[in-house]
UniProtKB/Swiss-Prot annotation:
A GO BP annotation: protoporphyrinogen IX biosynthetic process
Cofactor(s), names only, from the UniProt record: a divalent metal cation
Major place of residence: cytoplasm
Region (Important for dimerization): 241-276
Record EC number: 1.3.3.3
Record protein name field: Oxygen-dependent coproporphyrinogen-III oxidase
Family: Belongs to the aerobic coproporphyrinogen-III oxidase family.
NCBIfam families (alphabetical): PRK05330.1
Domain of life from the UniProt record: Bacteria
């Protein structure tokens, strides 16, 4: 697996570079600061953070490559046969929180796991996806996001986008609120049903599609005027983001349980957030429309080319 792991690592480092360059160019003011770190138990990474920009209030694009003698519970719970195997985990994970409430928060992740034991075949799989969390949503943005997702999946089979779109809707769901985190996208894990080269090609297609999915939405919305009321609603909805990441997100749990770097793991949290007791938007308002119309399991591409 050594050559394969090296190829995945080379791709992920290049993906991090390309995404950071594209986001810096779009912001026009802020620059990523890099923090290279080492994990005492094995491995390390490159954390890159950006903030206080013309566009991005806070964001990060992380690369990590960690390894150890046994998988943490979050990774082996649904695959108990892997308990006791040594592991390597590589990935790029990013979250972008724009200042303007009309520009959605975006998240993307692509990752590779390999669990090995002497005398046995290595067990490997890929995972990843991308999802969008709008505050003041627009249907054309949702359609564009999902169209890019569908087109990235298309060469790998007509059933791939619908399956991973539905998985995304299921995964990014706040059970205690009974509502989705955003308008979805793609999510998949344990991907090894194809041969390695095909799985790796799929991961590259998804990683490369993120900028194509996100930047046109950013460019359409970043100059939209906003007021303090809209910023307060954005902070309120960001609370849902925090709740999901700290309670349900498998990547966060894996990172914390495997002795990962806390600062990098919690990079995904927004800079300003608020909770109001039993707050509800005014009926018929833009804020109410988010939950009533957009935050629903919906086929955004129905009737679309």
């Amino acid at each position: 697996m050594t050559d394969r792991i090296a190829a995945v690592k080379t791709y992920l480092l290049d993906l991090q570079d390309r995404i950071c360059a594209a986001l810096e160019a779009e912001d026009g003011k802020a620059r990523f600061a890099e923090d290279a770190w080492e994990r005492p138990a094995g491995g390390g990474g490159r954390t890159r953070v950006i903030g206080d920009g013309a566009l991005i209030e806070k964001g990060g694009v992380n690369f990590s490559h960690v390894f150890g003698d046994s998988l943490p519970p979050s990774a082996s719970a649904h695959r108990p046969e892997l308990a006791g195997r040594g592991f390597q985990a590589l990935g790029v994970s990013l979250v972008i929180h724009p200042e303007n409430p009309h520009v959605p928060t975006s998240h993307a992740n692509v990752r590779f796991f390999c669990a090995e034991k002497e005398g046995e075949e290595p067990v490997w799989w890929f995972g990843g996806g991308f999802d969008l969390t709008p505050y003041y949503a627009h249907e054309e943005d949702c359609v564009h996001w999902h169209r890019v997702a569908r087109d990235a999946c298309a060469p790998f089979g007509a059933d791939v986008y619908p399956r991973y779109k539905e998985w995304c809707d299921r995964y990014f769901h706040l059970k205690h609120r009974n509502e989705p985190r955003g308008i979805g996208g793609l999510f998949f894990d344990d991907l090894n049903q194809w041969d390695f080269d095909t799985c790796f090609a799929f991961i590259r297609a998804i990683g490369d599609a993120y900028i194509d999915a996100y930047l046109p939405i950013v460019q359409r919305r970043k100059h939209t005027p906003f007021d303090e009321r809209q910023r307060e609603f954005q902070a309120y909805r960001r609370g849902r983001y925090v709740e999901f990441n700290l309670v349900f997100d498998r990547g966060t749990l894996f990172g914390l349980q495997s002795g990962g770097r806390t600062e990098s793991i919690l990079m995904s949290l927004p800079p300003q957030v608020r909770w109001g007791y039993d707050w509800k938007p005014e009926p018929g308002s833009e804020e109410a429309r988010l939950t009533e119309y957009f935050l629903a399991d919906r086929d955004w591409l129905a009737g679309q080319p």
